[in-house]
Amino acid sequence: MRILLSNDDGYLAPGLAALYEALRPLAEILVMAPEQNCSGASNSLTLSRPLSVSRSAATGFYYVNGTPTDSVHVALTGMLDTKPDLVVSGINNGQNMGDDTLYSGTVAAATEGIMFGVPAIAFSLVHKEWAHLGDAARVAAEIVRHYLDHPLPGQPLLNVNIPNLPYEELKGWRVTRLGKRHPSQPVIRQTNPRGEPIYWIGAAGDALDASEGTDFHATASGYVSITPLQLDLTHTQMLGATRDWARAGSGAS
């Protein structure tokens, strides 16, 4: 078995090292991660300049001076002779639930695997500062082992969020849907030394839909949340109304 491991916090992140150690007994692991922290990079590819790949003398991890998506893209199309059995991303320093998934570099690295026909799993710790990271890595390894032993049909993309709890206090796994957040806080305006305005992106909004069945509800209740994602963004319930709207517009023109 071969696993391609990446993240969005960078190749020096504790979450990457912990996940690597937890997965080593399960498969051959190739690590390719961003050189820098790329949180919030989403699915961006670097098209304006060439990329370079380096290797850490300390860990053997490969890293690229680009985004999480670049990392997986370069590994799959430029380094590996054969496809890995699984792409794994994480462990992220902070949750990726609800609307977070659209911005998340952690989820994006996993998504790039799906783009090339490789099943993928993204792992995140619900709260920052790496509390109970070893326990989270243990859970992640259990999920990966279960997937390798009992693969899901097709090419699944799983988004996993793990509460920051001791292993013994976790209540198990729960399959969930994405919740929803309130809009993020407004940007924070400041002034640079030249007197020019600069802006910091505000904090994420609080949970708007954290009802039972959502990732927010599961993790708040002490469960590991597993959400199957898909790349098709088509709003199928709007197809009929949009078709009628377009037909009316084209007929009037």
UniProtKB/Swiss-Prot annotation:
Function (record text): Nucleotidase that shows phosphatase activity on nucleoside 5'-monophosphates.
GO molecular function annotation: 3'-nucleotidase activity; 5'-nucleotidase activity; exopolyphosphatase activity; metal ion binding; nucleotide binding
Alphabetical keyword list: Cytoplasm, Hydrolase, Metal-binding, Nucleotide-binding
EC class of the enzyme, as a word: hydrolase
Protein residues bound to a divalent metal cation: D8, D9, S39, N92
Main location: cytoplasm
Name of the protein: 5'-nucleotidase SurE
HAMAP family: SurE
PANTHER family: 5'-NUCLEOTIDASE SURE (PTHR30457), 5'_3'-NUCLEOTIDASE SURE (PTHR30457:SF12)
Cofactor: binding details: Binds 1 divalent metal cation per subunit.
Subcellular location: Cytoplasm
Pfam families found in the cross-reference section: SurE (PF01975)
One GO CC term, this protein: cytoplasm
Entry's family note: Belongs to the SurE nucleotidase family.
